[in-house]
Amino acid sequence: MKKYLITALMLVMVLVVSACSSSPQVNEKNTDSTTASSETSATRPKLEIKASFYPMYEFTRQVAGDRANVDILIPANVEPHEWEPTAQDIAEITNADLLVYNGAGMEGWVDQILSSTTGSKLAVVEASKGLQIMDGIAEEEGSEGEHEEGHADHDSHDHGDLDPHVWLSPALAIQEVRNIQQELSRLSPDDATVFEANANAYIAQLEKLDQEFRQGLKNTKRKDFITQHAAFGYLAREYGLTQVPIAGLAPDQEPSAKKMSEIVNFAKTHHVKTIFFETLVSSSFADTIASEIGAKSAVLDPLEGITDQEKAQNVNYLSIMRNNLAALQKALNE
C-alpha cells in the first residue's frame, strides 16, 4: 500500500510541474519543407507512445511503423510484476499521446496514473480489454494444473487475482494487436489506412505462428508440463495442454514445502523429464525439483522483456515464441 501512496504523491508533483511549465511542443525530426496547407505523413508530428513492457512495445511498434515514436517503460532486466514508475517515468507518461498496457492486473501501477491524469491529452489502450480473462491460480491450489474457467469479459480495472498473461497465446495476441490498431486509428485518423495495413501484415505472421503451435503440439506424447510460475495458462488452454506451475501468478512467489512436495510427486508419477524455468527470476526451485527427480531444466520464456543485445540480434516475439514451441515439443515427446 505504501508504494502506491508514494506513486500518488509523485503524480501530484508531476502534474503541478507539468501545469506550470507546459508549452507547445515542436517536433524537430520532421522538417520537410512541404507547403503547409495540407499536412502529410512526413510533416505531421509523430505520436509519442509509451508501452508498459516488451510485448506491448512490440505489438505497438509493429502497428505504428514510422508514424510514432514508441518507447518501453519497464527495463529488460526488471520483472514487470514488480516494477513501479519513478517520478520521471510518470512525467513521461503524462506528456505522451498514448499509453499502451496489457491490463488484467499485470501493471498494478496503472490505475493510480489514470486516476490522476483525467483531462490530460493522454489516451490509453488496455490491450487485453474485451478478452476472456482467466482466473489466477493460488499458491496452495492442487498441482493438477491451471484454473481454466473463463472470467467475464474484461471491461473494468478491478482485476483482482486474474491471469494477465494473454500475450503468450498467439491467438489472443492477435486480438491485442487489433485493440492497439483501433486506438491508434482513433488518435491519428489520417494514418488509419497505414495502421490497418501494418496490423494485417503482423497478424498474418501471428496466424502462421498460431498454426505452428497447433500442428506442433497436436500429437505430442504427453500434455502436461511443469513451469516456474503460472504464466502459460492461456497457451496451455489454446493448444490442449496442462501447465503445472511451481508458483502462482507472481514468479518470485516462494512455494510452500507442501506445494514443492506435490510438484515432486506429480513429476515422479507422470515421469516428467524437463522442468521449465524462466529468464528474469531465480531458477532455484525448478533446479531443486529437477535435481530431486533426475530431470533436466530448460527455459520457457514468458516474454516479459528482451535485452538490447537480443534486439540487435533480431530476437523478437515471434522468434522467442518459436523457441518456446521447440522447447515444449522436445519436453512433451520425451
Model regions and ranges:
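Extracytoplasmic metal-acquisition and chelation regions
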Residues: 2-7, 20-334
